[in-house]
Amino acid sequence: MDIILATGGTGGHIFPAIALAKALKTQGYNCILFTDKKTNKNTDIESYTLPLRRPSSNKFKFFLFLIYSSMLALYQVRKLKPKSVIGFGSYASFPTLLAARVLSIPIILHEQNTVLGRVNRFFFKSAKLIATSFPETKYAEGNKCIFTGNFVDIKAQSHSSTEKILNILVIAGSQGANFFDDVVSSVICDLPIKMKKKIRVTQQCTKKNVNKVKSLYKSEKIDCELSEFFDDMENRLANAHLVISRAGATSIAEITLARRSAIYIPYPYSKDNHQFYNAKYIEDSRAAIIVKQNSEAKKNLTEVLFDLLNNSQKLRDMTNSTEKTGIKNGTTEFVKVIVHRFS
């Protein structure tokens, strides 16, 4: 039985789709990812690539390739005759969801953020079911909306009480990562000497800046490990005492489920400012602190980081507060819904 997963190639959309595909496979379903060209290197799940262009590029080309991709998706979906198309948001999911609507194939939507994305909003009325990652999601209201959680498999782990080194994990994400390379690393390097001796930094950097940031840390005698991408995020989170991160939905789910305190720096250009609202939900539960990316960001981040590293009780309180957020791994619950619907 085939199910098509319509998703975007960025981590926030693709990783939940991959997690769901693996879970559905154990129940006998064959899942095919329909997405854009950025996905192939990220997964071994069967996929079909649509020749899309980013909305921020040439507008004429964007709409031209969107129409072309919609025609390709219509042909492929008609040929596959799937039981359902599950959309994960992003402009890359639009052609496949449109094909499903034209062909009267049941549409199910999953929303990762606290604000229902524009493509998911467009297909809201056509969808049989909308699953959300946060207990509260703007624009997702009605009987067909259910809170399942995001699709991440991260478990909470405790720290060793005898550990004297504080591990700081810095997750830049795919959007605006240069800010983390420049500002976050600079703030860490400007900490007092005694504090720098007590920290270890694990940081995701852009490929072009890895050596530059590593040299900066070494010049300040800061123990560090840097990489463009970490494929063992669960282990990295398990070892972290504090996380500095963008506020993408998947990152927040992983950090919160790992029971880690965090400083979130929302990407200021995210659609509908959804990263800010994602982080605000966690901050309202006192499990994180938001630092906005603006002209005062360096000063504000310095103050927040200094305060947290000087106050172990505050860090512990934030860690304990992660359980109050209600964030959960929704994979098992969502699979049960799918199995029940199509059994």
Swiss-Prot record:
Segments crossing the lipid bilayer: none
Family: Belongs to the glycosyltransferase 28 family. MurG subfamily.
SUPFAM superfamilies, per database record: UDP-Glycosyltransferase/glycogen phosphorylase
Reactions it catalyzes: di-trans,octa-cis-undecaprenyl diphospho-N-acetyl-alpha-D-muramoyl-L-alanyl-D-glutamyl-meso-2,6-diaminopimeloyl-D-alanyl-D-alanine + UDP-N-acetyl-alpha-D-glucosamine = di-trans,octa-cis-undecaprenyl diphospho-[N-acetyl-alpha-D-glucosaminyl-(1->4)]-N-acetyl-alpha-D-muramoyl-L-alanyl-D-glutamyl-meso-2,6-diaminopimeloyl-D-alanyl-D-alanine + UDP + H(+)
Residues bound to UDP-N-acetyl-alpha-D-glucosamine: T10, G11, G12, N113, S174, Q275
InterPro entries xref list: GlcNAc_MurG, Glyco_trans_28_C, GlycoTrans_28_N
Pathways involved: Cell wall biogenesis; peptidoglycan biosynthesis
GO molecular function, one term: UDP-N-acetyl-D-glucosamine:N-acetylmuramoyl-L-alanyl-D-glutamyl-meso-2,6-diaminopimelyl-D-alanyl-D-alanine-diphosphoundecaprenol 4-beta-N-acetylglucosaminlytransferase activity
Gene: murG
Compartment(s) where it occurs, according to its Swiss-Prot or TrEMBL record: Cell membrane
High-level lineage: Bacteria, Pseudomonadati, Pseudomonadota, Alphaproteobacteria, Rickettsiales
Function: Cell wall formation. Catalyzes the transfer of a GlcNAc subunit on undecaprenyl-pyrophosphoryl-MurNAc-pentapeptide (lipid intermediate I) to form undecaprenyl-pyrophosphoryl-MurNAc-(pentapeptide)GlcNAc (lipid intermediate II).
KW Ribosomal protein (keyword) present: no
Protein source organism: Wolbachia sp. subsp. Drosophila simulans (strain wRi)
GO cellular component: plasma membrane
EC number(s) reported in the record: 2.4.1.227
Topological relation to the membrane, as annotated: Peripheral membrane protein
Location (main, coarse): membrane
RNA-binding in keyword set: no
Identification of the protein by name: UDP-N-acetylglucosamine--N-acetylmuramyl-(pentapeptide) pyrophosphoryl-undecaprenol N-acetylglucosamine transferase
GO terms for biological process, alphabetical: carbohydrate metabolic process; cell division; cell wall organization; lipid glycosylation; peptidoglycan biosynthetic process; regulation of cell shape
Short name of any one Pfam family annotated for the protein: Glyco_transf_28
Keywords of this entry: Cell cycle, Cell division, Cell membrane, Cell shape, Cell wall biogenesis/degradation, Glycosyltransferase, Membrane, Peptidoglycan synthesis, Transferase
